[in-house]
C-alpha cells in the first residue's frame, strides 16, 4: 500500500529534491548577517523548504532565519522530525558539478543527496502524502529544519530556546533500522602557544601548512610551503619515496624559491577516521624527517607524538571502549601553521557512555603544556541513549521491517544527529545496509530506490505514530 502511494509522487519528489540540491548551502561566516546567520546559502535552502510547504498548503514558522518548522496534524503531543539543509563543502575531485544535480536512470548525484537533503525531502513527502490522504491526525507534527548541523548546531540551540520541545521524534540523518544511541561529541583546538628563536640557522623553514576544512571530516588534501636552504633535489626525491612507501598521491613544485609539497588523502566522516586517509598528518610525518626551524619542529613532533596513526585516542591516553557504543575516536580535521602565528590542530573527539571526558581532558591538557601546547575546548555534547525496547522505537522498527523483511536490531553510532536534542529522539534512516555511504565525500549520491523506499517507510512510521491510536 505505502509503496504504491509513493509511486504516484516520484516525479515530484525528484524535482523538489533537485531544487534543494542546487542550492550551495555551505556555511559561510564571511557573508553571515542578521538575515542569514550562517551565510546566504543555508538561508536560501531554509526558504526553499518554506516555499514548497506553502505551495502544498502547510503552515510554517521561522526562527531568526537560522531554523524553522513545517507544521501538520493536530493533537496534544508533537512528533518532531529533525532535518537539516546545510551541507559540508564539496571538496575536489567530483565527476560533475556537486551543486548541479545529475539524475541518471537509477540515482541522483550531488552534494547533500544523502546528508541530509534527500532524507529531508523523503520525510517531507511522507507528511504531504498523509495530508493528501486526509487522515485523521492524533498528533501534531513539527518538521524542524536546521541550517548549521554540520558545524556548531547554532540552529537547534536557537530553536529550542523558545520553541516547543517535541514529545518524541526522529532525525532522518543516519541509517535504518534505527539508531537509538549516539556517542558524546566535542571539538577542541590544540594551540601552539610557546614560540622560540632559533640559535642556529635551520636547513629548512616551514612557512605555512594547511590541511582540512571541517572538524568532522578527515582532510583529503594538505599543503606545506618550505623554505629550503640547500639540497632541494634531495628533499624532493625523499618526498617522492615517502609517497611511494605510504601508497599516497602527492606533488612537489617550486614557487619563487619556496618548495610546495602536497599530499592527497581520503576524506570520510569524522566519526570513523580509521577508514579515511588523513593527508595532513601524513605530510607532517614527512616534514619530521627535515631539520626544520624550532617552532615547526615542535609542531611536527607534537603531531607524531600524539596524533599520527592514532584514530582511537591511543597516543592521547584516551583509548576507551564499551560494548554498547564502541570506541573513543579522534579525528584531526583541521591543521594550520604559519611561521608568525605558530600552529593549531582542530580535533573532533567522540566518546561512549562511561568515558570520563573532563578527567581525561584535564590530564591531557596538563601533559601537553611541556611541549608548548594548550587545549581550547569548544562545544561538548554528552552521549545520548534511548532504550531500543521503548514502544516508540519499536513502532519505527516495525515500519521498517514490514517493508524490508530485514530483522536487524537497532544499534548505536559514533555520529551525531539532531535526535540528541530530544529526550526521546532517535535517528531513523535514510540509509539502508546496501547503500554506499559517500556522506562528506566526492560524488555523493542517493539511488532512486533508496529515496522512494525511505519515503514509504517514513509514511508507514508516521501513520502508526500520529494517525493510529
Curated annotation (Swiss-Prot):
Output the lineage of the source organism.
Answer: Bacteria, Bacillati, Bacillota, Bacilli, Bacillales
Q: Per its UniProt entry, what is the enzyme's top EC class, as one word? A: hydrolase
Positions contributing to Zn(2+) 2 binding: 84, 115, 173
Sequence similarity: Belongs to the peptidase M20A family.
According to its UniProt record, what is one Pfam family this protein matches? Answer: Peptidase_M20
Q: Name one GO biological process term.
A: L-arginine biosynthetic process
**Name recorded for this polypeptide:** Putative dipeptidase SACOL1801
| Regions that span the bilayer | none
- Keyword Nucleus in record: no
GO MF, one term, reads: zinc ion binding
E.C. number, please? 3.4.13.-
Q: Which cofactor does it need?
A: Zn(2+)
Binding residues annotated for Zn(2+) 1, in chain numbering: 115, 150, 440
Task: Please name the catalytic residues of this protein.
Answer: 86, 149 (proton acceptor)
